[in-house]
Amino acid sequence: MITIPESDLVVHPLCLGSNIFGGAAPEAESHLVMDAYRSHGGNFIDTADMYNQWIEGHVGGESESVIGSWMKSRGNRADMVIATKVSKLDRRPGLSAKNIVAACEESLDRLQTDYIDLYYSHSDDETVSLEETLGAYAQLIAEGKVRYIAASNFTPARVRESIEFSEDNNL
């Protein structure tokens, strides 16, 4: 097991990606995959609100729903570290505060949990100020809905800017 730097999240070194759960891998098969992963010590699952929206008849969120039903049926939420992402869902893109908060609530419902361990900005949104985006995350952390945040598909300069802003503003 390893600890994610700057956190108390202790995770298996292999994170299980779930972008096909609820799509190419139906729910029952996805549950079997997660059971096998868990039986080998796995505890870290990555998903996103937009996963499976590219499949006809899907709207996104299917992967989160499958993970939520699995955790509920196994009673293992406290043993798992769940990472999910916001900003690339077609029907609600971006990193505005309103979108982040709404997307978080929907992800919590689909995941059948009251907190997200690691909440990613799935891609940058330079049309929204860092103050607004990071302020929304700070609110969710203060409310206990999110434990830690992360960024995916950001330039190194934008990551540096985000870190500096957070440090300067005690976020």
Where are the predicted features?
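N-terminal binding-site loop/beta-alpha segment at the start of enzyme catalytic domains
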Residues: 1-80, 142
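Glycine/proline-rich, positively charged
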Residues: 88-171
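A cross-family glycoside hydrolase active-site/sugar-binding cleft signature
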Residues: 15-19, 48, 83-85, 119-122, ...
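A short, structured active-site edge motif that brings together acidic residues
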Residues: 78-90
